[in-house]
UniProtKB/Swiss-Prot annotation:
It comes from Mus musculus. One of its GO terms (biological process) is morphogenesis of a branching epithelium. InterPro entries: BACK (IPR011705), BTB/POZ_dom (IPR000210), Btbd7 (IPR042345), BTBD7_BACK (IPR047936), BTBD7_BTB_POZ_first (IPR047934), BTBD7_BTB_POZ_second (IPR047935), SKP1/BTB/POZ_sf (IPR011333). Signal peptide: none annotated. This is BTB/POZ domain-containing protein 7. A lipid is attached at residue 2 (N-myristoyl glycine). Transmembrane segments: none annotated. The keyword Iron-sulfur does not apply. It is found in: Nucleus. Pfam families: BACK, BTB.
Amino acid sequence: MGANASNYPHSCSPRVGGNSQAQQTFIGTSSYSQQGYGCESKLYSLDHGHEKPQDKKKRTSGLATLKKKFIKRRKSNRSADHAKQMRELLSGWDVRDVNALVEEYEGTSALKELSLQASLARPEARTLQKDMADLYEDKYCTDVDLIFQETCFPVHRAILAARCPFFKTLLSSSPEYGAEIIMDISTAGIDMPMFSALLHYLYTGEFGMEDSRFQNVDILVQLSEEFGTPNPLDVDMRGLFDYMCYYDVVLSFSSDSELVEAFGGNQNCLDEELKAHKAIISARSPFFRNLLQRRIRTGEEITDRTLRTPTRIILDESIIPKKYAKVILHCMYTDVVDLSVLHCSPSVGSLSEVQALVAGKPNMTRAEEAMELYHIALFLEFNMLAQGCEDIIAESISLDTLIAVLKWSSHPYGSKWVHRQAVHFLCEELSQVMTSDVFYELSKDHLLTAIQSDYLQASEQDILKYLIKWGEHQLMKRIADREPNLLSGTAHSVNKRGVKRRDLDIEELREILSSLLPFVRIEHILPINSEVLSDAMKRGLISTPPSDMLPTAEGGKSNAWLRQKNAGIYVRPRLFSPYVEEAKSVLDEMMVEQTDLVRLRMVRMSNVPDTLYMVSNAMPQCCHMISHQQISSNQSSPPSVVANEIPVPRLLIMKDMVRRLQELRHTEQVQRAYALNCGEGATVSYEIQIRVLREFGLADAAAELLQNPHKFFPDERFGDESPLLTMRQPGRCRVNSTPTAETMFTDLDSFVAFHPPLPPPPPPYHPPATPIHNQLKAGWKQRPPSHHPSRSFSYPCNHSLFHCRTAPKPGPPPVYLPGVKVAPPDCTNTTGLGRQTVAAAAAAAAASAAIIPEKQVCPQPVLNDLMPDIAMGVSTLSLKDRRLPELAADTELCQTVSEAGTGPPQHLSCIPQRHTNTSRKKPTLEQKADGRENQQEYPDLYDFSNAACRPSTPAPGRHSPSPAHGRYFGPDLYSHNKASPNGLKSVYLPGQTSPKKQEDPRREYPPSPDGHPHRQKREPIRLDVVEQPPQRPDFPSAASENASHGPAHVRARTAVETDLTFGLTSNRPPSHSACSSEVLEERSSRRLTDSEPLGHGAHQRNADLERGDSISRGRRSPSKPDFLYKKSAL
């Protein structure tokens, strides 16, 4: 019996013997073939149900009325009525809608196949071959030793004698217990490993080692001539059971419990004995193995060996009835559960038989015997016998036994596997069950389980009709139970005279059906003008009309059979085979008459939520990937139980479960289900998860083990982690590994292209130099670069810069200054992942020298981390319009400086820059001119233009530090829109490719009236971003220089500034306007010794910055009524 349904035998199991006719079908009248549950053919065969009314018709007398004849004919043609109703429904539909309905049915059919496989899954039972292999390896209960090449091989006399004629003759010469027999093998080339493999073959029927000598035909012929050719293992074991040669244990049964406890009372009280072998019963049952080992420890076994008598085991017949003993032994030797052996053995009345005689019941049925034997198998821990009994019970399910099997399997001591098969039979045969008296004996729980299924084989109208009848029958039973005992059994009792329908209490009937009617899919009742539905609404059993009667937002009517927007919660139609067949037939006809396959393409509505917060809430259940939930900070250790009652399995078992889950995900059947069920990935994932749980013997409630294994094993990796997940700090957030390899960066170099487009730029972020972070980065494997991610990715990247980046060489560990607070690493920070600039390093030194108390430090940028989709929405507005002209300007800068400069330093590289939003309306040129007269220090946070994103350069009257104070003439970090004045160009490394080679035609802005380009009038912000500089050898010197002038740069927060605006305005206070020009010239000349034209461009750029400062400050004045704050793009 395999662990999954794909390895199961078809209808009957080889372990089940006896009635061959009952073995031809698995459950009821259908077999569990996949073809029988698809939409290609009828989902379930009910042919025998159509013959039943015809048989009754033959037996009716000639006095039957014409009305009854019409009723019987109408019942026999029920399936034809269903097809007609579906055809009438689809008569006015568009061909695309019919195709959508058929696709929905196909998706449901794929889910049904997975559900069927999950219902058939159960743990794999150990076979005779596996138990015999363990018996040879563990060597318990051995009784003879073979000596070969000075090596002792403990073996079992009975097994070798039954399997090999050579050993049968050899062992008969030494019958005593523990005899040592020296082996003398004449076949050449047999060594000790090969001899051990030969013994393993006699135990299991297979060689236990891979040896090329066993492929040699000559050696095999010589071995067969000397030892003989053994029969198949099952044949020899059956012969051993029949003849019981060399038996060494006797099973005795007694109904006197005191005798069993005393062990050694009057032997006349013992009944007939059964012979067996210790090796076999201990190998198959842990119960007998522990019993025999306990006898060895207590010394009782030595007494039996001394007296040369078989070991006697006395069993209490109230626990293990004697009539089942032979069936148990037969299964131990043959792996077959044959109840025919039960009727051949003498029956000593068991407790169940006594109860049956007292109650006046007939003999036990085959299913009842299997139920009783199932409990004995669980007691003996004999799984093969238990699963064989389950097969017998499942095969016996029919209309007559359905109620008994459902009740037995619903109990805690029943079989959950049998219960799933009984519920499946109820769902498949519900149309037949509803028309029989068995339907009224069903409990409410069983009915509720059935009507919740998407695979119910009944129409919604019949379900509603017979549910009401079932409720009326239950109400009548209540009335009968409430009547006085005096009337019971008389002509005036309710059971005799009956109760009319109008006499039933509607309120009480509604209370009985209150938990069942909500699961009737009223929107799918056919015909639309159903009398059953209208009657139920008149009686008040159904209070709300179907959604077809409710108008939608468009003013039309919603189609409850299809997925539509603004149509409320969608409930898929049941996979009722007559409806499915007729829908496919109608689609085939419409395709031939109206259209071809190309015109059938349409957008399928799925269950993907429209709101972002719904995604995070649904991820742990909906995602088919394994989710990762770290242990919270207040939790000291991972939980030891799941679902409050199930112990967490061992790590080895957990890894096997995850491996099995990954294996199932890659099967063609599961992939087809994922493809056909758009937006239903949660259902597909859950089906394969519970299948794996059942294969490993765990309850369905333990699904969290597979949905979130990292919660229970936080230190383990299960094969689906990505670099982004490993960068998270434990206990910070919950992450689901949903992105695939095509849409997720898996290398450090790909982080260079990240441009979090949230204006203004984020405040400083300090990645820590922790050894764990370095180990994780070192552990990432290099993967081939994937194609550029689409714009749907949370962080839009600069595609043109992908190929002009080289991986940075690992530099020295970063040095942190005193007072600088170490913060966790930021995945969205490009410079923090290996690339530093002169501006970033100098700004870090300036900030460290002029450090402010922690209360004034800006908060860490977490918006990109928590809401990447909002960042995506802001960035996509300007990504296309801004990138092309910006890169064009940068390309010209790179080329000119590379020609003028002799050798650019490595840190003067082109850095990916931040994009801003340009969707607002631009003010006219006249408004810009007027705005120059008003100068303010406060930037407009709601203005996302280029000028608004840059602080104004101070006027000549203010202190303006030179580039040596932390400024840099290269490309700006956060904008591509700044062109250097007077021909100053950016510098690229020799190994880098200019973006001009990547970008073709560039769009340029129209020039302004004063001759300068339009974008030159908007001087951008130059924020001092504090970053860690891993590759800055001149960092200490820069820090010392800025430290000498540190107090001059410290500026406290003004009264009108807030946490958002502090640090974004000019950081050069007017109190220090007098600065030595010699110091400025000295530092400028020291930095620009290699290039004279570079110095000239610096002075010209200073003038332009000062002129642009007055323009931008006046234009952004918040006090002017003409220039109100612009509307935020967020």
